[in-house]
Amino acid sequence: MCNNEAKMSELLSVQSDAPAKKINLMDLTRQQMREFFKELGEKPFRADQLVKWIYHFGEDNFDNMTNINKKLREKLKAVAEIKAPEVAVEQRSADGTIKWAMQVGEQQVETVYIPEADRATLCVSSQVGCALACTFCSTAQQGFNRNLTVSEIIGQVWRASKIIGNFGVTGVRPITNVVMMGMGEPLLNVANVVPAMEIMLDDFAYGLSKRRVTLSTSGVVPALDNLSKMIDVALAISLHAPNDELRDEIVPINKKYNIKTLIDSVNRYLNVSNANHGKVTIEYVMLDHVNDGVEHAHQLAEVLKNTPCKINLIPWNPFPEAPYAKSSNTRIDRFQKTLMEYDFTVIIRKTRGDDIDAACGQLAGDVIDRTKRTAMKRQFGQNIGVTEVN
């Protein structure tokens, strides 16, 4: 049985065991939705129509889908629904950035819209909280509760698109790029992140270019090695340190997959990817007198000498009780210039949305149950949240 058929059988078996529970069509890729319609005794092309209604037109009411006959609409209403996360809180920054706290069950995750002159980027969450315990990140301090479902991930894009609306009417630039850089580690939720990204790329849905969908990871190497077999999207690596001793401290997953292991995996991905223009994005948060010295820049250049990349230097964004300080502009500039001497492309990322705690590393959401992270920490020590991928 193929993966799509297995998925549909699982969904439909749940449906038969619990008739009151409807299938959320946002949990299905277009191919899975075609299988769903076949199970209903309908033509598979109906899936193409549904996907276009849901994502192109932002429609979640079957009655408004005028090219679908009434009998089928009634059948769909009986067994299916179209349900995206609702906005619990919206905050708007003076610089145009918008942060939404999206309600997912009893918890909330955060989604950030970042408009620029020539594009608009949506930063999407993949988990409720995060289990990786990076010491400089607010999300990690909230603990971990669970993975988001496909509908909770793609639903963030749907909800944001619905709010932003038509550029000609609202004056707000439509979403052109999606980055999986919100709450959570995407490669610890591959089963739901990949289908959500497939919907982003689908021409019947959002039709984004693979170069405009970026997955950011702290380095879950087995999942990264498998990623290219599942989907081709742009890749960003949350590196943040140039040596294992320091990275073990601030990005604890490094104890499981060290820098060399991670960079080797990145190079393998680049060898088969068409989405990255031959380069990976390296993310490096600047922590005052921790990882921002000239010696660190030289070490980073050595680590990346055989990896085509561009380097984003990210001014650290404070959060309560954090043990760090923000690097001075002088230290960041010196770090950049040192790397540029090695002919790297180095960009100092402009901080956006920090007045509403929407900047990099500040997303926290509302993680009610932290017991899972505590239990995982007891079992694995600092290597929490690491799942082997076959």
Curated annotation (Swiss-Prot):
Full protein name: Dual-specificity RNA methyltransferase RlmN
Signal sequence interval, chain numbering: none
Additional free-text comment from the UniProt record: Reaction proceeds by a ping-pong mechanism involving intermediate methylation of a conserved cysteine residue.
Record-linked Gene3D superfamilies: 1.10.150.530, Aldolase class I
Documented EC number(s): 2.1.1.192
Annotated keywords: 4Fe-4S, Cytoplasm, Disulfide bond, Iron, Iron-sulfur, Metal-binding, Methyltransferase, rRNA processing, S-adenosyl-L-methionine, Transferase, tRNA processing
Annotated HAMAP family: RNA_methyltr_RlmN
Organism annotation: Haemophilus influenzae (strain ATCC 51907 / DSM 11121 / KW20 / Rd)
Family: Belongs to the radical SAM superfamily. RlmN family.
Catalysed transformations (reactions): adenosine(2503) in 23S rRNA + 2 reduced [2Fe-2S]-[ferredoxin] + 2 S-adenosyl-L-methionine = 2-methyladenosine(2503) in 23S rRNA + 5'-deoxyadenosine + L-methionine + 2 oxidized [2Fe-2S]-[ferredoxin] + S-adenosyl-L-homocysteine; adenosine(37) in tRNA + 2 reduced [2Fe-2S]-[ferredoxin] + 2 S-adenosyl-L-methionine = 2-methyladenosine(37) in tRNA + 5'-deoxyadenosine + L-methionine + 2 oxidized [2Fe-2S]-[ferredoxin] + S-adenosyl-L-homocysteine
Annotated localization: Cytoplasm
Record-annotated disulphide pairs: C123-C360
Names of the cofactor(s): [4Fe-4S] cluster
